């Protein structure tokens, strides 16, 4: 209970930094679970660090700004407004956001920009198509019921499981990375 009160106070006073810390923690935990479920012999700390860093320093700030921009979309009919926001989110933001995550994740794996781009082209469509089976429902709940400062957190709670999937899909063995560490 004390931790919930602490988080509520932090979200009221410093929403971005609080959301960044929570996002990094949840994302790192999701990667740990993905590694465990894939029966990795040894825990890859660098892999977990990459996911945590990307989530806290890129995803959380991007979503923080995005949800505030999405709030500026106005309309008289609540149902139509929800559909409008959902379409903007899933057809404009989500494809770009997924691409940026995949590209940056590969850069954090010490891939070249060219190799990162090639891997993005290889993985993007399947990941985006799968995201359309999950995130529209999450966003309906988010946009209808969740206060603005809590939306990134709800996304990250769902992203705990999504990141397990993303981690599994994107962490194909890469020979030269293993020798780098």
Swiss-Prot record:
Signal peptide: none annotated. It holds the Pfam family Mpv17_PMP22. The keyword Transmembrane applies. Its main location: mitochondrion. The chain crosses the membrane at residues 20-37, 51-67, 86-103, 152-169. One of its GO terms (cellular component) is mitochondrial inner membrane. Keywords: Membrane, Mitochondrion, Mitochondrion inner membrane, Transmembrane, Transmembrane helix. It comes from the Eukaryota. It is found in: Mitochondrion inner membrane. GO terms for molecular function: channel activity. It is a multi-pass membrane protein. GO terms for biological process: regulation of mitochondrial DNA metabolic process. Involved in mitochondria homeostasis. Belongs to the peroxisomal membrane protein PXMP2/4 family. This is Mitochondrial inner membrane protein Mpv17.
């Amino acid at each position: 209970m004390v931790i919930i009160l602490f988080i509520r106070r932090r979200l009221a006073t410093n929403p971005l930094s609080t959301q960044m810390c929570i996002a990094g923690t949840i994302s790192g935990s999701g990667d740990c679970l993905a590694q465990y479920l894939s029966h990795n012999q040894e825990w890859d700390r660098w892999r977990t660090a990459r996911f945590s860093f990307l989530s806290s320093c890129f995803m959380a700030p991007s979503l923080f700004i995005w949800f505030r921009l999405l709030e500026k979309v106005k309309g008289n009919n609540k149902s139509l407004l929800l559909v409008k926001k959902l379409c903007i989110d899933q057809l404009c933001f989500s494809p770009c956001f997924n691409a940026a995550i995949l590209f940056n994740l590969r850069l954090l794996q010490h891939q070249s920009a060219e190799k990162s781009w090639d891997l993005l082209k290889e993985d993007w469509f399947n990941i985006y198509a799968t995201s359309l089976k999950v995130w529209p429902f999450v966003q309906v709940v988010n946009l209808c019921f969740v206060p603005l400062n809590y939306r990134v957190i709800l996304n990250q709670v769902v992203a705990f499981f999504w990141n397990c999937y993303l981690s599994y899909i994107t962490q194909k063995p890469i020979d030269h990375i293993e020798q780098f560490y």
